[in-house]
């Protein structure tokens, strides 16, 4: 593997790649656990792990900024960090029921930040390593399918 690509540290790109794929798989497991258990308790626990992934994402973001990598490299981790702060607040610190009944003022920004972070963290790998990007595309598809199944079962 390379030491750097397009002025960005390769280790930071691999870190973000690991974060985005871990988020996809953890959230997919969370959706599927709701179907199996009929509860969101497992999903709630997995959310803490997703939140912890903001730490390596922020370390990678700082490396991208310090190496003067293009905005596309650091934007995904930055949006993910904003999502994690928002998630921690509405799901853990001051819990708000916004999924059911739907509270659009919370749900829309929550979903935009979440899926925006997934897109923006995955996008740079398209240029850097197509094989790794395909892994991200596959885990994202798995996330979307598991979300669709959870919606179909009324537990999303």
Predicted regions and their residues:
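Short, strongly hydrophobic alpha-helical membrane anchors
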Residues: 1-12
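N-terminal signal-anchor/start-transfer transmembrane helix
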Residues: 10-38, 143
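Structural signature of hydrophobic alpha-helical transmembrane segments
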Residues: 11-24, 71-82, 137
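C-terminal ends of transmembrane helices
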Residues: 28-41, 88-97, 148-155
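Membrane-helix boundary elements
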Residues: 40-74
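Small-residue-rich segments of transmembrane alpha-helices in multi-pass membrane proteins
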Residues: 48-60, 103-119
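Membrane-helix boundary connector in multi-pass membrane proteins
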Residues: 92-105, 116-135, 152
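Small-residue-rich transmembrane alpha-helices that serve as helix-helix interface/gating elements
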Residues: 131-147
């Amino acid at each position: 593997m390379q030491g750097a690509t397009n002025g960005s540290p390769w280790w930071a790109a691999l870190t973000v790649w690991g974060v985005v794929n871990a988020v996809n798989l953890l959230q997919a497991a969370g959706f599927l656990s709701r179907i199996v258990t009929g509860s969101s308790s497992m999903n709630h626990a997995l959310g803490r792990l997703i939140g912890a992934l903001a730490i390596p994402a922020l370390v990678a973001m700082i490396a991208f900024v310090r190496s003067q990598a293009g905005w596309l490299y650091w934007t995904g981790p930055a949006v993910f960090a904003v999502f994690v702060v928002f998630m921690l607040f509405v799901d853990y610190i001051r819990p708000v029921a916004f999924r059911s009944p739907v509270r659009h003022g919370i749900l829309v920004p929550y979903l935009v930040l979440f899926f925006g972070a997934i897109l923006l963290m995955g996008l740079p790998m398209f240029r850097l390593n197509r094989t790794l990007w395909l892994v991200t595309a596959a885990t994202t598809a798995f996330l979307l399918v598991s979300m669709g199944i959870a919606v179909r079962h009324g537990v999303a």
